[in-house]
């Protein structure tokens, strides 16, 4: 048995689930009766995890956003992890949605502070885009997991490398 157990907290998104949500949203876009005859498009930039929505109507643009968000939820991606980057209007209305797939330094410090303030017997350290949490007892690690899940963060929090 290991003398010290640990795990990593990250906000990494499963790129395949993101792509699956995109494919499902595109399929629903093709079959939705209320979107027939209206020029609507959904594109995904996989490298940057950006959904590019465009429509000839601003109201339908919000419908497209709702479709994408609902498909992300069904694929297990937290809707809070989706940020609206830009909204453009003109002949076509455009909206860019970015899937936040990294813990920024501000959120990392916030998570680290909450863990330290919890008075649990754990050590936490920020390692780039991840936070490593180590403890002698697995029960303490599970308490930290519960604590982090209860935080209202705009991230898709995941726990990995539980050792």
Curated annotation (Swiss-Prot):
Keywords: Nucleotide-binding
Entry-linked Pfam families: DUF520
Cellular component aspect of the GO annotation: cytosol
Keyword Nucleotide-binding: yes
GO function terms (MF aspect): nucleotide binding
Function as written in the Swiss-Prot or TrEMBL entry: Nucleotide-binding protein.
Family in the record: Belongs to the YajQ family.
Name of the featured protein: Nucleotide-binding protein Cj0374
Organism: Campylobacter jejuni subsp. jejuni serotype O:2 (strain ATCC 700819 / NCTC 11168)
């Amino acid at each position: 048995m290991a003398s010290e157990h640990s795990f990593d907290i990250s906000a990494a998104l499963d790129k395949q689930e993101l792509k699956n949500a995109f494919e499902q949203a595109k399929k629903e876009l093709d079959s939705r009766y209320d979107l027939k005859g209206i020029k609507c498009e959904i594109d995904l930039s996989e490298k940057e995890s950006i959904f590019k929505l465009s429509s000839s109507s601003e109201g339908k643009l919000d419908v497209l956003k709702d479709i994408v968000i609902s498909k992300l939820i069904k694929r297990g991606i937290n809707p809070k992890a989706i940020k609206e980057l830009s909204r453009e209007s003109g002949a076509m209305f455009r909206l860019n949605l970015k899937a936040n797939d990294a813990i920024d330094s501000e959120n990392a410090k916030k998570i680290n502070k909450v863990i330290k303030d919890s008075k649990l017997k754990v050590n936490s350290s920020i390692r780039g885009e991840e936070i490593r949490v180590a403890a002698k007892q697995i029960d303490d690690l599970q308490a930290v997991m519960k604590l982090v899940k209860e935080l209202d963060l705009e991230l898709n929090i995941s726990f990995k490398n539980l050792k």
